[in-house]
């Protein structure tokens, strides 16, 4: 039996220049998990095990024209590591997720130093929420007659 989106567990990863933002879902809601240094393969595998993750959603950095940024290469390299570890991986366009997360923090009156500490996890949360929202729209198990 195929699980609906709300019954599956996803881990969202947003690759920043030095850190990886991590988010997971609780049903159809994305929640932040934290921020890791970019070379944290073992920790991410630990999250996958701890949260019984069915699939990892990796944010793919794209330009406004839809072309891959240089950092997309790093995301793809990391995806190959996950796949070789038996993890199911999917890419998702992460354009503007950091901008959206940063604007939310500014609207809450947060300063630059506060934002810098958690913006990667917030961007991963925004990206994963967008992914979940799109999946629910196309998931036939989620549709009501």
Curated annotation (Swiss-Prot):
It is found in: Cytoplasm. GO terms for cellular component: cytosol. PANTHER family: POLYNUCLEOTIDYL TRANSFERASE, RIBONUCLEASE H-LIKE SUPERFAMILY PROTEIN (PTHR33317:SF4). Pfam families: RuvX. GO terms for molecular function: nuclease activity. It is an enzyme of class 3 (hydrolase). InterPro entries: RNaseH-like_sf, YqgF, YqgF/RNaseH-like_dom, YqgF/RNaseH-like_dom_sf. The keyword Nuclease applies. Belongs to the YqgF nuclease family. The keyword 4Fe-4S does not apply. Keywords: Cytoplasm, Hydrolase, Nuclease, Ribosome biogenesis. It comes from Tropheryma whipplei (strain Twist) (Whipple's bacillus). It comes from the Bacteria. Its EC number is 3.1.-.-. This is Putative pre-16S rRNA nuclease. GO terms for biological process: rRNA 5'-end processing. Could be a nuclease involved in processing of the 5'-end of pre-16S rRNA. Its main location: cytoplasm.
